[in-house]
Amino acid sequence: MAEDQMWVEAWSPEYGSSSEVDGGLASSDEEVDPFVETTEWRAIVPGLSGQPAAAFIDGVDRVDARAFFGGGAATSPGLFGSVAAGAVVVDGGRARFETCEVQRWSVFGGGADPRVRPFSSAITYRGRSIPGTRPEELRNELQKARSDLEEDLSRRLAREGMLVIADGPLRVREPVNLVGYIKSHQKTYLSPGHAPVALGLACGERTPIFGFGRIRPRYSWYTRIAAAPNQHPWAAIARCEVSTTVGLQRAIGLADLVTHHLPRFASKAFWDTRAPQNLVPIATLERKLWSLLGDRDLVMRRIRSGVRAGGRADA
């Protein structure tokens, strides 16, 4: 009988875990076709060379202040929040920031839609209204604004013919070179018979492509981006996905391309607290985007002083 082992999570605790598990990954409730690419489930080593230009996409969001709107006992909860999205383009040995954009939103629940005047020339909030009133519903709407911004940027760069690697699950359903990069695992899409292939991957190898998704059909695969001795079995393994609209042969080409090149972008523990899955271009971009949001305390003071000075127009 194998001896039990203990691992210390490589990620810093404030980011949760790279594998949200309770004894093992839960199985996805999606209907998965594991034989999209081949019936022989074994590790695949891409036979590629060269370094194609690639754009790495990510976004951030932040609640700047909580708020209420209304009169007497009839008040609607809301928030002021900032979102940002951008890209790092890596071409050969050079990298550059591309199109980093900041948006600021006021989100109010209960159908309330107060029109907010600009608090300053640099801090202007556009309005969103939702029927719900729970704090998580307000936050979800802010996150949707961030996702929309990321999606628009991903679509634009992919339409220009660039290889785009977007942090997180894929939402765009177009036949473009857009790859969703999922760095943490809450569930597995592999059966007990196929999961050992993913866990046994060497750096720069991938599983065969499998298909899933009724509403948003996708091709997906697992790949190991770095060695991870003495860590959880799923550490340093990422899942990637593309829309089925690209077609199987193009998906195979993208899977080989991404699998071959991702290891050179794996971060190191001394530099990033979510290493190695938090890729260096994405981690660099995150830091840039957070800086663009501005100091939270200063932004909150502008909001408070603006509201006190009558920064709200008629509802």
Segment roles from a protein language model:
Residues 1-48, 52, 66-69, 94-315:
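Long, contiguous domain-sized segments
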Residues 55-57:
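Short hydrophobic beta-strand that contains or immediately precedes a catalytic carboxylate
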Residues 60-65:
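Short acidic, Gly/Ser-rich segments with clustered Asp/Glu that frequently serve as metal-coordination loops
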Residues 69-77:
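Covalent nucleotidyltransferase core used to form phosphodiester bonds in nucleic acids
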Residues 83-87:
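Short beta-strand scaffold segments in enzyme catalytic cores
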